[in-house]
Amino acid sequence: MARRATLLHRVRDGLPSDATLVQVAGPYEFLEPGDVQAPAGTAGPMAAALARLAPDVLCLAPEEAAMLSRSGLDLPQSAVVLSGAPQTRVVPRGGVRLGFVFFPMTGKPGAEPESKARAAVVTAAREMRGKADLVIGVSPWGSMAEEAFLTANPDAFDVLLGAGHGFGTPAMPQPVPRTLWARSHTKGKTIGRLDISLPVKKPDAPWLVGENHRAELLNPDYTVPGDPDIAILGDAPTVAAAPPPATTATP
């Protein structure tokens, strides 16, 4: 987490003065899907580091929330712990209303979501359209289920931040042109950065690389020095958000 903090500082320090940074920390940032506890001696430092990093949007799988609570972390009231039904939040930043739809958990990691769960997500996304300028999904379903969902519902979301089993990729307008689909690797292998130009595109307009967005995966590898304020907390493995934590909007 110390290396991740360094990368986030670099992103923040490199932004134009009129840009807004929104950090999103998603499910499976601390545990692999299916795990219930962190390696011995790491949960406490991870909880302390998370408290210092203080992401704008914090979304946790239920087992992660339980693990962090056992480690003494009081989750902020704004934290979202995924459940059996979609949850929503509107987060205003820099004059833009960010509408988040947090997908429900499946029966077990990697399992195909039930049709009822898929329909509930679509309904939540449609209801969010009238409340937000940008509708963002946060999913723990894994890459296969997410791709199938986007293909079947190409207009549901402007951005989908995916997590769980599967590959990592910077935000790309695939498999549908009007949704940016981003996936970071679990447990710290990458951090996703997404820069969105303002004004935000209309829902029926496609995403065009270099025109209305830019995206990349940042790698907190051994070449990145750890932030000393985080490193001093103890033996916490470097973890990166899945979905991406660094989202910027620039005019």
Predicted segments with their positions:
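Acidic, metal/ion-coordinating pockets
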Residues: 1-251
